[in-house]
Swiss-Prot record:
Gene Ontology MF term list: asparaginyl-tRNA synthase (glutamine-hydrolyzing) activity; ATP binding; glutaminyl-tRNA synthase (glutamine-hydrolyzing) activity
Its biological purpose: Allows the formation of correctly charged Asn-tRNA(Asn) or Gln-tRNA(Gln) through the transamidation of misacylated Asp-tRNA(Asn) or Glu-tRNA(Gln) in organisms which lack either or both of asparaginyl-tRNA or glutaminyl-tRNA synthetases. The reaction takes place in the presence of glutamine and ATP through an activated phospho-Asp-tRNA(Asn) or phospho-Glu-tRNA(Gln).
Stored Gene3D superfamilies: 1.10.10.410
Quaternary data: Heterotrimer of A, B and C subunits.
Keywords: ATP-binding, Ligase, Nucleotide-binding, Protein biosynthesis
Protein name: Aspartyl/glutamyl-tRNA(Asn/Gln) amidotransferase subunit B
Disulfide bonds: none
Amino acid sequence: MEYKLVIGLEIHIQLGLKTKAFCGCKNEFGGVPNSRICPICLGLPGSLPSVNVELINSAILAGHATNSKIRRVVKFDRKHYYYPDLPKGYQISQNDKPICEGGSLLIETPSGFKKINIIRIHMEEDSGKSLHLLDSENQSYIDFNRSGAPLLEIVSAPDIGNGDEAVAFLSSLREIFRYLDLSECNMENGSFRCDVNVNLIVNESGIEYKTPIAEIKNLNSFKSIKAAIEYEELRQQEEWIQFRKTLDSCGKHTRGFDDKSGITVIQRNKETVSDYRYFQEPDLPLIEIDDFYIDNIKNLKLIELPFDARVRLKAQYGLSDFDVTTLTSDKHLLRYFEDAVINSSDPKKVANWILSEVLSVLNDKGISVLEFNLLPSHITELVEFIVADKISGKMAKKVFSEMMARKVPASVIISENQLEQISDEFVIKQIVLEVLNENPKSIELYKKGKDHAIKFMMGQIMKKSSGKINPILANEILLQSLANV
């Protein structure tokens, strides 16, 4: 008996638009409950929605970024269901004619690149938010500030084979939306939410069976998503062995994931499309989009995406997979690097400095590269001093610290403190000879194979030069001189 895990994802991304999807209320996170609402948000009688054109523009841009086909006629539908945080009793969404279809993303797996197909991207509005207070057993509250917030829902094909692939797909999608400034994609504040559909294909003696699909909710991190998938795979294997439930006989159900226990718990049977009683939104007209409009959004707003940037950086600068992945994790960090290497003779060394020293400072201070107080050109100049052997790597770190403290270029600090390395071979030979003449016992110890003698003499050389001598060159000249003694 063989099991194949099948995973599909439904991702809701709240767009960072100034106003909501179908009214003029501000689209912001948090704030005083029920302070950003209007009759349209609440679905009061007589209120009429109007489409936020930026919602359509964002959907078109997302379609371009995911290689999707973009529909030329936009239609909105009413999706009916009853829940306390949905005051209208329906959600404005898209049913049979989503704005984008047939897209795909490439993800990187241990065995190479894998294409994950995207079934559809559609536009809709968010619901309100139910608040259940810990100090009250009988009362719940509803904040409608989120009601009507603009959403895109991305539905992947069931092409994902394990938790790692699911996380890779979500990470790639999040990177794209952040690069395009479409959304912060923050799972903590709910601007990036994911439901995971999981089932198994069981092969018994050449006959295939499909287990019931579990739609898993309450997933608040990539770690939770991976853990839920791994648990659900084992649960469905055990359920198949005991009860042999199939998709045809049991259909689809919803389960919640409990972070503390690491298990999924059944919530309800999943609604079918007919349960939602979809019909075309009568208060919103069909919207026609021509090719010029679609192409114009692509030309104006579609920038180089992370995957393409990684391929280019590896080819252009010979950087490692780790380096390019880290540099492209933030488009502002990538821009900082690109600005720093424009006039650099050693792009790899610039990358190393940004990924080690600069990122260390950013992480320690909890700031972004946009808030960093040194310009890319400052890093370029500092690295050039190292490449030219004018300062050592150790000295460069001290210079870097003073650069940040004083907000001045490396050249100013190096000049003021006379920190340039001594790399003149004639000068170094003179210092080496002085040390050899002053330490005949160390020479004898070296000839007897005592390695510590070399360290001692190098220490004396560094002391005589006040630490300014080029240690690599000094060590070479010392060994040459000892060979001739």
